[in-house]
Amino acid sequence: MNFKYIVAVSFLIASGYARSEENDVQSLSQREVLEEETLREIRGIGGALLSAGKSALKGLAKGLAEHFANGKRTAKGHEVMKRLEAVMRDLDSLDHPEEASERETRGFNQEEIANLFTKKEKRILGPVLSLVGSALGGLIKKIG
């Protein structure tokens, strides 16, 4: 009788422990799913903001390119035009990163790919802002 009692209690303890482990694993996987969904939402918002920023920069760059294309070109204006064209190509490559950098990203893991695009965006935004500033400064000087 004592042996059966010990076996039954041991079985109950083992099954209770297994259930608690199973619950821990389920709650952990639920937390991971929630974290993944949150990250997707954040990436979606960031992607939308980045897309809007790229569209605005594209529109501004196109406007500046048209302005410089219509007037007389000096050496400085020609250089600015070439930079704007390069920026436009880079912005287009950001819209289709899988096509534009397929050769560059082969063999990289996801984190390295994300770092590559972040560096590329920083590399593009710096010259774009300086070009916009210099173009607006030139326009203000001509107007004033």
Curated annotation (Swiss-Prot):
Tissue and organ expression note: Expressed by the skin glands.
Organism of origin: Bombina maxima
Similarity remark: Belongs to the bombinin family.
Cellular component GO terms, alphabetical: extracellular region
Cross-referenced Pfam families: Bombinin
Keywords for this protein: Amidation, Amphibian defense peptide, Antibiotic, Antimicrobial, Cleavage on pair of basic residues, Cytolysis, Fungicide, Hemolysis, Secreted, Signal
Residues found modified as Isoleucine amide: 143
Protein name from the UniProt record: Maximins 6/Hv
Keyword field contains Signal: yes
Signal peptide boundaries: 1-18
Propeptide residue interval(s): 19-43, 74-123
Cell compartments where the protein resides: Secreted
